[in-house]
């Protein structure tokens, strides 16, 4: 959790500085773990989006009648590649 907002300004500044340093250390360690043990790139893989020509909103059936749902899953037809695979299969 982020540091608490208590104490003097100097104490808060020191806590924030230590917290940011700890977060940087955690981030660098997690990058090393991802790259060495899992063989994955530490940077996130960019999401592969389909071309805009393949996207369509089919509003012939029940547009406006569903209330809160808006766009149903049957109205957008896009085959998404398996980019969001968690990579935790063993």
Swiss-Prot record:
Residues spanned by motif Nuclear localization signal and RNA-binding (RRE): 8-24
Subcellular location: Host nucleus, Host nucleolus; Host cytoplasm
Keywords, comma-separated and alphabetical: AIDS, Host cytoplasm, Host nucleus, Host-virus interaction, Methylation, mRNA transport, Phosphoprotein, RNA-binding, Transport
One Pfam family this sequence matches: REV
Disulfide bonds: none
Record region (Disordered): 1-24, 64-90
Any one Gene Ontology molecular-function term assigned to this protein's record: DNA-binding transcription factor activity
GO terms of biological process kind: mRNA transport
Record's comment on post-translational modification: Phosphorylated by protein kinase CK2. Presence of, and maybe binding to the N-terminus of the regulatory beta subunit of CK2 is necessary for CK2-mediated Rev's phosphorylation.
Residue numbers covered by motif Nuclear export signal and binding to XPO1: 47-58
Sites bearing Phosphoserine, chain numbering: 66, 73
Comp. bias intervals (Basic residues): 10-24
Residue ranges with Polar residues bias: 64-78
Gene Ontology CC terms: host cell cytoplasm; host cell nucleolus
InterPro entries per the UniProt record, alphabetical: REV_protein (IPR000625)
Subunit structure: Homomultimer; when bound to the RRE. Multimeric assembly is essential for activity and may involve XPO1. Binds to human KPNB1, XPO1, TNPO1, RANBP5 and IPO7.
Additional observations: The Z-84 isolate was taken from a 54 year-old Zairean male.
Annotated function: Escorts unspliced or incompletely spliced viral pre-mRNAs (late transcripts) out of the nucleus of infected cells. These pre-mRNAs carry a recognition sequence called Rev responsive element (RRE) located in the env gene, that is not present in fully spliced viral mRNAs (early transcripts). This function is essential since most viral proteins are translated from unspliced or partially spliced pre-mRNAs which cannot exit the nucleus by the pathway used by fully processed cellular mRNAs. Rev itself is translated from a fully spliced mRNA that readily exits the nucleus.
Domain notes: The RNA-binding motif binds to the RRE, a 240 bp stem-and-loop structure present in incompletely spliced viral pre-mRNAs. This region also contains the NLS which mediates nuclear localization via KPNB1 binding and, when the N-terminal sequence is present, nucleolar targeting. These overlapping functions prevent Rev bound to RRE from undesirable return to the nucleus. When Rev binds the RRE, the NLS becomes masked while the NES remains accessible. The leucine-rich NES mediates binding to human XPO1.
Protein name (record): Protein Rev
The organism of origin for this protein: Human immunodeficiency virus type 1 group M subtype D (isolate Z84) (HIV-1)
Name of the gene encoding the protein in the UniProt record: rev
């Amino acid at each position: 959790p982020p540091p608490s907002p208590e104490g003097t300004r100097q104490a808060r500044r020191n806590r924030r500085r230590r917290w940011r340093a700890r977060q940087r250390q955690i981030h660098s360690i997690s990058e090393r773990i991802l790259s060495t043990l899992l063989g994955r790139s530490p940077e996130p893989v960019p999401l592969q989006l389909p071309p805009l020509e393949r996207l369509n909103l089919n509003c012939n059936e029940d547009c406006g009648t569903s209330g809160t749902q808006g766009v149903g899953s049957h109205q957008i037809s896009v085959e998404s590649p398996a980019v969001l695979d968690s990579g935790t299969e063993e």
